[in-house]
């Protein structure tokens, strides 16, 4: 059932019916379909989307916001740990609050990743989880099953390598995929054991360099030594790994199920599953990172535009949510009647969430994007031989305390 709309703002010269949207290329099919559905009942409003890759999109958004030329509707990121995260954008005065909207009552009161000074500043559509994305059929043919204990990762990688198919795709050239291993392992080794770890960091009571974060980087180094990855991770892009994964040339990748629609487009015959990435020898204590992901904000310059507000409310409607979860995958961030998981991977993530065996993406708690930037550059540097596990953690500490 479509949520009803209550518009705010006044008709003025700013009420242009020509709107622009800044979107993530991963979500293009869903956003295009959402715009089409919106236009079915709002034929007089034209929305022109422009799509970017994650890293390129972050840079373009910041350049355009600084120049005053950014789109009216911005696909952003929850929390404050990325340059395009809603809290960082709100703090810098780039986006407007979204108070008393039809969908806002469904945002959990304890979810601070969408709030700035207590006020909601983003429309959440889907949540995701980080884990090993793979095809059971492809693994069955290889005679392998995903590891559930850390010690099994080595034997899994060696067995996969012996068959000529790397176990894990590593698209480090794209940037953001470098964070996935650390997010997955520290969910278990750090945050499940000490949920207040980040708060203690800001109080200078602990640090990345003095914690299991260093071990997580050492584990990633070990995976490289064991032959877990394809050749030249720093020269491999996300698009290249998608093609290799769909063709069975790599067995899986540690990341988000948002890759699944692209994999289905490349290989419609496969079903894609999810396995938690182990960090210890006790599978029962494994946590996964899981939190809101696809989120939209409204440019402050467009905040008085009733048409922009109308579209923002549509993004929070059941119609738009159904389209997003069906075409992009993910778990509805707002309750959606009749929801059925779009893949086995999503069902697996929901099972972890139902058991409480998850921790939010940690960058949602970081107060500045420089921490994540130090992490990305650090992992790329480690694979280039210019950084060590300890030096990455130290540079992340420096970024946290400086910003």
Question: Which residues are covered by each model-predicted region?
Answer:
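Extracytoplasmic/periplasmic substrate-recognition and gating elements
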Residues: 40, 67, 142, 264-328, ...
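Extracytoplasmic/periplasmic solute-binding protein
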Residues: 121-124, 154-205
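Glycine-centered hinge/linker elements that transmit conformational signals in sensory
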Residues: 202-233
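Conserved C-terminal helix/tail region of periplasmic/extracytoplasmic solute-binding proteins
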Residues: 140, 351-403
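Conserved N-terminal structural module of periplasmic/extracytoplasmic solute-binding proteins
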Residues: 3-88, 100, 104, 268, ...
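Hinge/lid segment of periplasmic solute-binding proteins
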Residues: 79-130, 154, 160, 181, ...
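Long, aromatic- and glycine/proline-rich binding clefts that accommodate carbohydrate-like moieties
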Residues: 109, 275-276, 325-374
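A structural signal for short loop-to-beta-strand junctions that line the ligand-binding cleft
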Residues: 64, 72, 76, 99-138, ...
């Amino acid at each position: 059932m479509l949520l009803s709309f209550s518009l705010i703002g006044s008709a003025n010269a700013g009420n242009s019916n020509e709107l622009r949207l800044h979107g993530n290329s991963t979500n293009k099919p869903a956003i295009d379909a959402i715009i089409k559905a919106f236009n079915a009942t709002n034929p007089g409003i034209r929305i022109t989307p422009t799509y970017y890759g994650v890293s390129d999109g972050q840079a373009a958004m910041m350049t355009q916001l600084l120049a005053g030329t950014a789109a009216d509707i911005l696909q952003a990121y929850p929390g404050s740990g990325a340059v395009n995260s809603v809290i960082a954008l709100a703090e810098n005065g780039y986006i407007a609050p979204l108070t008393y909207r039809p969908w806002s009552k469904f945002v959990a009161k304890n979810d601070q990743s969408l709030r700035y000074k207590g006020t909601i500043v983003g429309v959440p559509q889907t949540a995701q989880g980080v884990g090993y994305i793979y095809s059971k059929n492809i693994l069955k043919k290889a005679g392998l099953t995903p590891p559930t204990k850390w010690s099994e990762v080595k034997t899994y990688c060696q067995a996969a390598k012996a068959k000529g198919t790397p176990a894990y795709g590593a698209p480090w050239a794209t940037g953001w995929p470098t964070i996935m291993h650390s997010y997955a392992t520290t969910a278990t080794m750090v945050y499940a054991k000490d949920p207040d770890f980040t708060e203690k960091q800001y109080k200078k009571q602990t640090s990345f360099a003095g914690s299991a974060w260093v071990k997580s980087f050492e584990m990633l180094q070990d995976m490289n030594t064991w032959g877990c990855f394809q050749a030249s991770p720093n020269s491999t892009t996300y698009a290249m790994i998608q093609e290799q994964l769909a063709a069975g040339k790599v067995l899986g990748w540690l990341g988000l199920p948002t890759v699944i629609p692209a994999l289905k487009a490349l290989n419609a015959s496969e079903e894609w599953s999810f396995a938690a990435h182990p960090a210890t020898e006790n599978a029962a204590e494994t946590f996964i990172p899981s939190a809101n992901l696809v989120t939209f904000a409204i440019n402050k310059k467009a905040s008085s535009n009733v048409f922009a507000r109308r579209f923002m409310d549509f993004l929070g409607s059941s119609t738009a949510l159904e389209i997003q979860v069906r075409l992009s995958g993910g778990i509805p961030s707002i309750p959606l009647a009749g929801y059925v998981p779009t893949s086995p991977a999503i069902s697996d993530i929901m099972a972890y969430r139902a058991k409480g065996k998850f921790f939010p993406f940690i960058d949602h708690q970081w107060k500045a994007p420089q921490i994540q930037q130090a992490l990305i550059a650090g992992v790329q540097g480690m694979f280039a031989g210019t950084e060590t596990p300890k030096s990455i953690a130290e540079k992340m500490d420096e970024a946290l305390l400086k910003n």
